[in-house]
């Protein structure tokens, strides 16, 4: 299985859970909600026969079939499902390091590319000040409408960050973008960094 690894311990644990469902042919379905965003969540659910989606990738395992959601497959690359025993019994863990990483290229829609650079280049720097910026919209004239949050909302340096950091980076990476506009209410200063 190239996209995801299910350890023997996880397989045995899941097989035991599935056997208790009294449903012949039941398997699991692995998917990511909101893949490629900061809100991505990796999920495993029971999958009764007929509940799999036509475009799912079926992976036959020793005791059951795992169905991988087609949209989620690129985000499941290098994912690991494991089961570790502890004093309380044990815990199934899912580690999907690429779940929140947007998958974009130069042919991707402009909003996906903007979000990609915001998440991978801009927000990691803003996080050191407890802040973040998000895309609200791309208006017809090629302007990205952004909103600051956290420590950036109300910060006295937001204009400098917007023009010297964010706009410069986005214009270098996305040639058809014409500029950025801030719609943040900066009168709210209780969490401002500066």
UniProtKB/Swiss-Prot annotation:
Cofactor note as given: Binds 1 [4Fe-4S] cluster per subunit. The cluster is presumably bound at the interface of two monomers.
Required co-factors: [4Fe-4S] cluster
Single Gene Ontology MF annotation: iron ion binding
Keyword Iron part of the UniProt annotation: yes
InterPro entries linked to this entry: Fe/S_biogenesis_protein_NfuA (IPR017726), FeS_biogenesis (IPR000361), FSCA_dom_sf (IPR034904), HesB-like_dom_sf (IPR035903), NIF_FeS_clus_asmbl_NifU_C (IPR001075)
Domain of life: Bacteria
Entry keyword annotation includes 4Fe-4S: yes
Annotated keywords: 4Fe-4S, Iron, Iron-sulfur, Metal-binding
Ligand binding ([4Fe-4S] cluster): 152, 155
A Pfam family the protein falls into: Fe-S_biosyn
GO-annotated biological processes: iron-sulfur cluster assembly; protein maturation
Disulfide bonds: none
Subunit structure: Homodimer.
UniProt record similarity statement: Belongs to the NfuA family.
Record's function text: Involved in iron-sulfur cluster biogenesis. Binds a 4Fe-4S cluster, can transfer this cluster to apoproteins, and thereby intervenes in the maturation of Fe/S proteins. Could also act as a scaffold/chaperone for damaged Fe/S proteins.
Cited HAMAP family: Fe_S_biogen_NfuA
Protein name as catalogued: Fe/S biogenesis protein NfuA
Species of provenance: Pseudomonas putida (strain GB-1)
Lineage: Bacteria, Pseudomonadati, Pseudomonadota, Gammaproteobacteria, Pseudomonadales
